[in-house]
């Protein structure tokens, strides 16, 4: 019962603020997750205060279970509590309730918050004041804008209000909103802060009634310091000046639609304004408090604050600042005063001292914000350009997926290189590989290329697979033999992977099916090659004579076919192959791990290995492609 009773009291105290509720941990806290790593909460109370505010034990349990060793607390209130329960993970930046922090302190708090969250992606910042809305919201909104999570400050304020309040009421005090705008203008580079000294000449406040003017008292502070001046209505330093009736009547007539009873009464009364002569040098932040005094005793005794006002000297335009009633802080009795009530502050810049141009913390943070924003814009531009390139490549792949007519010159097209078969007499097939990660599988005689070269046309592979159907030693089938012996078109098999540029699933499926068909054809061809090799061994003398006569009598295509036929035996699995690679080919990473200083041959009778000390000459060339001489220098040892 006690827990239910206290829970209802806490809900009434927190009013419209979102609460953190967990049945598993049995917690009900005045705490809200503004982002995944920023928390706003009310003051953690102890003893009797914990009955209507957050209990410090419950807060400690939540942080230890969900963010153990990764949390830091910012205490913005003027009060302290037992920090040892939270492992002393607390930073104190106290300033008054319903007030903004001084401008320099505002930047210090946001900078410390940013440094903590940048140190580790899992770090969590917990910010609290008394109620966890006004002062807390001022700091969090400035950080959300400074970290480039929101490009517009109003969006950051709306986000905080939505996450913290059920009625979407976040930072409501005018001076706190004013300092948030100060922060935005400085960080974005819209306003350059120069610390200088001005002479505060006077304050004018009106229109007021006679009783109101006689009961007011004033205090002027340099923010976060003791008051530098005190003024009461009974003293000689305050002048009460009547306002002209014509002006008052015209002002009242303009506001008849907005104010019914109050304006009718003001039209019948003489209105006044208060003029306070100050003549005091001030700088940085200025705080003005207005009180209602006790006029019954004829003294300017301070009784109750009506409102206060805070601004910074660096943002004074020309020689005056004008503030309306909607810019006064904590003005609860505003209905008793004229709606046109305003305060005018006059300054004079007649100081001989030069302004302070030293490098301040806001200058450093402004530079950091500009760098973060520029890097973010560059990353967004890069993402857009990458998306455009991907869409262009997808369109090109879809356009190239259509079948092309079969021609005598087979061409394999990839994303980066193009491989073709020349038909000249003394030319050899060229291997152009676009990826440096190519590997050679000598058993299956396949060159597995990287996914970057996986955009080859399917028509060329289909034409090659069709030409592998049968084999013969006659000259009429040499065209099929030459197409079967082509390294360029038969050995390159692109792999379909997730990193391939073939984003279209149908194209990848077709290419994979074609590769499966080609593998089946290769198995059949290997069996045919074994039979052909046996026939070649039985008819060696006759084939040599035929080859010599055909080499002298046939045309350029016959000589090219004979070269390809010899080369085809190198990749057949039926014979024992020993290769002496060229150093030029090793640069393509095709023969890595296969370089040997001698060749071995196996004697089938006694299963012993005999070392053949014959060495092969290595021809040095400037290109990376195998030439005809490289192929002729390969020793073929057959059983």
UniProtKB/Swiss-Prot annotation:
Disruption phenotype: Cells lacking cnrN form abnormally small groups, which can be rescued by the expression of exogenous cnrN. They also overaccumulate cAMP during development and form abnormally small fruiting bodies. Five seconds after cAMP stimulation, a prolonged and higher peak of phosphatidylinositol (3,4,5)-trisphosphate is shown compared to wild type cells. One of its GO terms (molecular function) is phosphatidylinositol-3,4,5-trisphosphate 3-phosphatase activity. InterPro entries: Dual-spec_lipid-protein_phosph, Prot-tyrosine_phosphatase-like, PTP-SAK, Tensin_C2-dom, Tensin_phosphatase, Tyr_Pase_AS, Tyr_Pase_dom. Residues 619-628 have a biased composition (Basic and acidic residues). One of its GO terms (cellular component) is cytosol. Residues 598-608 have a biased composition (Polar residues). Signal peptide: none annotated. It catalyses: a 1,2-diacyl-sn-glycero-3-phospho-(1D-myo-inositol-3,4,5-trisphosphate) + H2O = a 1,2-diacyl-sn-glycero-3-phospho-(1D-myo-inositol-4,5-bisphosphate) + phosphate. GO terms for biological process: aggregation involved in sorocarp development; cell motility; G protein-coupled chemorepellent receptor signaling pathway; myosin II filament organization; negative regulation of actin filament depolymerization; negative regulation of asexual reproduction; negative regulation of phosphatidylinositol 3-kinase/protein kinase B signal transduction; negative regulation of Ras protein signal transduction. SMART domains: PTEN_C2. Keywords: Hydrolase, Protein phosphatase. Transmembrane segments: none annotated. Residues 20-190 form the Phosphatase tensin-type domain. Protein phosphatase that negatively regulates PI3K-dependent pathways. Regulates cAMP signal transduction to control territory size. During development, a lawn of Dictyostelium cells breaks up into territories where cells aggregate in dendritic streams to form groups of 20'000 cells. This is Phosphatidylinositol 3,4,5-trisphosphate 3-phosphatase cnrN. The lineage of its organism: Eukaryota, Amoebozoa, Evosea, Eumycetozoa, Dictyostelia. The gene is cnrN.
